[in-house]
Amino acid sequence: MTNRKAKQKQESRAAIQVSAAALLRERGIKASSVMDVMKGAGLTVGGFYNHFDSKEDLFVQVLQNGSRANWNGLLKLARGDSPRARALSVTRQYLSHKHRDCKDAGCLLPGAAAEVARAGEPYRSALEKELSSFIKSFAQMIDAGNESREKAVALLVLMYGALSLSQAVAGTRLSNEFLQAGKKLSERCLPRET
């Protein structure tokens, strides 16, 4: 395969994954057809199987890559001179109006979690792996000794729940209250600096 063809194939594969991620957020896995994914990527349906073995293969990879990219991007935005400050900057970014309203590039979890639970394997394993990886990285950032992992898990649950509820009632006062409550509870969850 020539370099040009290899690059074109790589670009097509990326476009398919971007389209699938957008559909995952908007409709979920079950309601997203291969035809819809390919249409969103600006490609013909016939080319799909040059890139992925099945719809399941595509969405498993989207869950892995999309979750990883989202979490890694969030962790890279961490700012502050202390572990607490960096962790709070992550929670504030995640629970921001901008992130809530960014349906096409935000976190995959609110749109995917319930469906992944119903769909079972291999989706569940893919998501579990990515969540575990984020928890490990977040726990290292929190740096709260023996409680680091527990706090990272608690914060992830809090962040996801607040964002999910906020998105469900977006455009209302209650939506903003969910984000604010998530931020306040995050502050309480993290160890105070000495």
Language-model regions, residue ranges each:
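N-terminal intrinsically disordered/low-complexity leader segments
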Residues: 1-9, 192-194
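N-terminal positioning helix adjacent to the helix-turn-helix/winged-helix DNA-binding module
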Residues: 5, 12-19
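Helix-turn-helix
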Residues: 15, 23-57, 61
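Hydrophobic alpha-helical connector segments
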Residues: 61, 75-106, 144, 155
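Short, basic, alpha-helical segments at the C-terminal edge of helix-turn-helix-like DNA-binding modules
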Residues: 64-70
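Amphipathic alpha-helical segments used for helix-helix packing
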Residues: 86-89, 100-128
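Hydrophobic/aromatic-rich alpha-helical bundle segments in the mid-to-C-terminal region
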Residues: 120-129, 141-194
